[in-house]
Regions:
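Structural beta-sheet core signal
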Residues: 58-60, 94-97, 146
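Sec-dependent bacterial lipoprotein signal peptides
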Residues: 1-17
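N-terminal "domain-start" segment that seeds a small globular fold
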Residues: 17-52, 72-74
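Thiol-/selenol-based redox modules, centered on thioredoxin-like
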Residues: 141, 146-186
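Short acidic, S/G/P-rich loop/turn micro-motifs used as interaction or catalytic elements
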Residues: 64-69, 101-103, 160-162
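Short active-site neighborhood of thiol/selenol oxidoreductases, capturing the structured segment around
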Residues: 48-72, 78
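Structural microenvironment flanking redox-active thiols in thiol-disulfide oxidoreductases
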Residues: 71-114, 129-131
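Short, internal strand/loop/helix patches
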Residues: 108-141
Length: 186
């Protein structure tokens, strides 16, 4: 019985690693679509969300399985990353996409409008971002990604929680800067 449990545990770990690898390979290099139904939150109003098509984008996506009100309260944590990234490549936009549950939508909208309207927050009340980008896994480790100006994923990972991701992001930004907004693999 003990050997069976060990074998099953090892099999589960191996399958999990294969899933993560497959999710990574499916997302890396794919093109991300910003659906027209996204709304920009400004104060107490919503406006159509429009991206600058000539800029690179750092997308930070919070789906309905995550605590969106918690995410809103932590937007200020991104300030130093945003400032440092823009000092490397000024043509980068940080896009925070919030897709809260129906029950949290009003609170999230209010919190963004009152406290965080200076951030580039897109509100997705219909789940259109997820539907338009089926290559993005549900695993939230894949919900922070750097896109070049063509909206191709060039880096996956959150630089807030990993110095190695931050170093890779700086290298990728230099690559994008040196190649007119496009990422060129070495």
């Amino acid at each position: 019985m003990k050997h069976l449990l060990i074998t099953l545990s090892m099999l589960t770990i191996c399958l999990s690693c294969n899933t993560v690898r497959r999710d990574y390979e499916r997302l890396m290099g794919s093109q991300v679509i910003f659906p027209e139904t996204l709304q920009k939150v400004e104060r107490q109003d919503t406006l159509p969300f429009v991206t600058n098509k000539d800029n690179a984008h750092m997308v930070i996506y919070y789906d309905s399985t995550q605590c969106n009100t918690c995410a809103v309260s932590k937007l200020g944590d991104w300030d130093s990353i945003i400032d440092d990234a823009k000092s490397i490549y000024e043509d980068i936009d940080f896009v925070f996409i919030m897709s809260p549950t129906k029950s949290d939508q009003k609170k999230v909208m209010r919190d963004i409008g009152i406290n965080y309207s200076d951030y580039n927050v897109a509100f997705d009340d219909s789940g259109a971002f997820s539907q338009s980008n089926p290559q993005i896994p549900q695993d939230n480790r894949f919900h922070t990604m750097l896109l070049d100006k063509n909206n191709n994923v060039v880096l996956i990972g959150n630089p807030l929680y990993s110095n190695s991701i931050w170093e890779l992001m700086k290298e990728a930004l230099m690559n994008i800067k040196n190649n007119n907004g496009q990422f060129v693999a070495n």
